[in-house]
Each structure stands twice: as C-alpha cells, then as structure tokens.
Amino acid sequence: MRYVAAYLLAALSGNADPSTADIEKILSSVGIECNPSQLQKVMNELKGKDLEALIAEGQTKLASMPTGGAPAAAAGGAATAPAAEAKEAKKEEKKEESEEEDEDMGFGLFD
C-alpha cells in the first residue's frame, strides 16, 4: 500500500512516469524503508496503466466487499433485544440509587 500511495503521489504531482528512485525518495522522506523487490513488483504492475481507471476499478472492488460487522449484528439483533432491555433496566436502577446518594451529600454518616 505504501508503494502505491507513493506512486500516486508522484504521478499526481506531475511526474507521469515515476521511477523506483522517485518512489524511494518519497518514502524515505517520511522515514519509511523500501523493500526493493516489493517496490519493483508494484512498479511493474502500475507501469503504463491509467491511474484514474485503476482508482475506479479499486473503488468498485471495495464496494463489492462485505463489511466486517454488519452481517453479524443483523443476524443476532433479535436475540439480543431482551438482553438490551434488561441492561437498560439495571442502568436505571443504578442511576436512581446514585441520585439518592447525591441528595444527602455525605451528611448521612451520623443517622
């Protein structure tokens, strides 16, 4: 991902065909070390491709991927409803108790 981001940064700044040295310079400017074999692989994959088309293709691929928590929450929603109601009732009871404690402001020590 870091190599793709550096490549896009170089390309969007006006360098139509960034070299590996350009990418290494960008990454080293922020303290990131380069793995030459991974960088070369990314460069070979991106060479000669239209960046806007790649971005559009990536967006469609990301849109088709399922999100992490949504299916599990939808499936277990009906089963957790009674538990949620019980938690709310317990919270209300605790809240009422704490309000009573606040009213005496600590003067109930000698009652």
UniProtKB/Swiss-Prot annotation:
One of its GO terms (biological process) is cytoplasmic translational elongation. Keywords: Phosphoprotein, Ribonucleoprotein, Ribosomal protein. Disulfide bonds: none annotated. One of its GO terms (cellular component) is cytosolic large ribosomal subunit. Residues 85-97 have a biased composition (Basic and acidic residues). The keyword Kinase does not apply. The modification Phosphoserine is found at residue 98. GO terms for molecular function: structural constituent of ribosome. Plays an important role in the elongation step of protein synthesis. Belongs to the eukaryotic ribosomal protein P1/P2 family. PANTHER family: 60S ACIDIC RIBOSOMAL PROTEIN FAMILY MEMBER, LARGE RIBOSOMAL SUBUNIT PROTEIN P2. This is Large ribosomal subunit protein P2. The lineage of its organism: Eukaryota, Metazoa, Ecdysozoa, Arthropoda, Crustacea.
